[in-house]
Regions:
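Conserved NTP-donor binding/palm subdomain of two-metal-ion nucleotidyltransferases/polymerases, i.e.
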Residues: 1-197
């Protein structure tokens, strides 16, 4: 395979992204470990669920919980997330909460420093969207509203620095600008140095 991120496949006029990896494994050993866990979960046939009478299968709720959060964190740290990410999480919890092994999920979140982000997402779901979180879903009301509200505020800002359509030097300038704009996310939410890999 000669691509890192994904290739494209044309299937009956529909463009499909074919990802070699679920996560950016170049981001360090934790991402590689989580990638292996996601592969284990997706290959765990006893938890795959058939979609109707088709030969298509949905991955387990454990896979989806970890992947949804990892995907949202990646966009949050390096770009920005929109309300859609919170709604994806809220609807996932509403439908799948009983199928998730929350103890294992929380252990992974602690290991890869996603716990604070998840607590913020849960806080937004509960306190801003009015969702009643199931007892099995971890929350941390002692954290307060500051950080979840800062994340929510960031979602609605129009100053997101997107690099689509830029090439060469302009791409690099915007990439560096976006990186410095998002330093607070590494320090306050991810609790890692932005230069950590």
């Amino acid at each position: 395979v000669d691509f890192y991120k994904h290739s494209h496949i044309d299937f009956n006029g529909l463009e499909i992204e074919n990802h070699q990896f679920a996560l950016p494994i170049k981001d360090g050993p934790e991402m590689k470990a989580l990638e292996l866990e996601l592969r284990r979960l997706i290959c765990s046939s006893e938890k795959l669920r058939r979609m109707g009478s088709t030969h298509l299968y949905r991955p387990s709720a454990d896979f989806n919980a970890l992947f949804l959060v990892a995907h949202a964190v990646g966009h949050f740290l390096y770009e920005s997330i929109r309300l859609r990410s919170v709604l994806d999480w809220a609807f996932f919890i509403k439908k799948e909460h009983a199928s998730v092994d929350w103890e294992k999920f929380c252990a992974w979140c602690d290991r890869i420093n996603y716990s604070k982000f998840v607590m913020c997402m849960n806080y937004i779901c509960e306190h801003q969207l009015g969702m009643k979180l199931p007892a099995s879903v971890k929350r941390n009301d002692e954290m307060g509203a500051y950080l979840p509200m800062r994340i929510l505020d960031d979602m609605f800002k129009d100053d997101a620095l997107y690099t689509k359509g830029y090439g060469g030097l302009m791409f690099r300038i915007h990439l560096v600008g976006r990186y410095f704009k998002n330093l607070w996310k590494f320090q306050e939410v991810y609790e890692r140095n932005a230069f950590y890999l």
